[in-house]
A protein has these predicted regions:
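"A position-specific structural signal for the A-helix of alpha-solenoid helical repeats
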Residues: 5, 10, 69-76, 112-120
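Short coil/turn connectors between adjacent alpha-helices in alpha-solenoid helical repeat scaffolds
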Residues: 17-26, 77-88
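Mid-chain, well-packed structural core segment of small domains
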Residues: 61-85
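N-terminal alpha-helical interaction modules that lie
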Residues: 1-64, 94-98, 119-123
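Amphipathic alpha-helical binding modules
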Residues: 81-123
């Protein structure tokens, strides 16, 4: 769980520079998140959701929490990567929807993120 908390702090830094032109720092933070989660972006984008959950579970049953970090990373990366933005947003939305259905805890934050991403995809 310490890893998830630390990665949450990295994600918060990425959120803080969302509209900043410091792409070097954002790219470094994004790489840190994917590397720490032991997955690369291509795998995360192409893997089916159940396989992604199993890969991220890492034996501690925190796969859903790591999936949520991946989804939020993809959302933030979409602001810095216009070429892959649509694919990143689509997968982030799919992941969050999967988590919302699979998790025992209902999350208003997830619902709002899903709506936010849907609006971004419709613009």
């Amino acid at each position: 769980m310490v890893q998830i908390e630390e990665l949450g702090k990295v994600l918060a830094q990425l959120f803080d520079i969302r509209h900043d032109s410091n792409d070097g720092k954002s790219e470094s933070l994004i790489d840190t998140l994917y590397t720490s989660l032991k997955i690369d972006k291509h795998q995360a984008l192409t893997m089916d959701l159940e396989t992604l959950r199993i890969k991220l579970d890492q034996g501690d049953h925190a796969g859903l929490q790591r999936m949520e970090l991946i989804a939020k990373t993809m959302l933030e990366e979409s602001f810095h990567n216009s070429i892959e933005a649509r694919a990143l947003l689509t997968k982030a939305k799919d992941i969050l929807t999967y988590i919302q259905k699979s998790d025992q805890t209902f999350s208003l934050e997830r619902v709002e993120l899903i709506d936010f991403i849907s609006n971004l995809l419709n613009d």
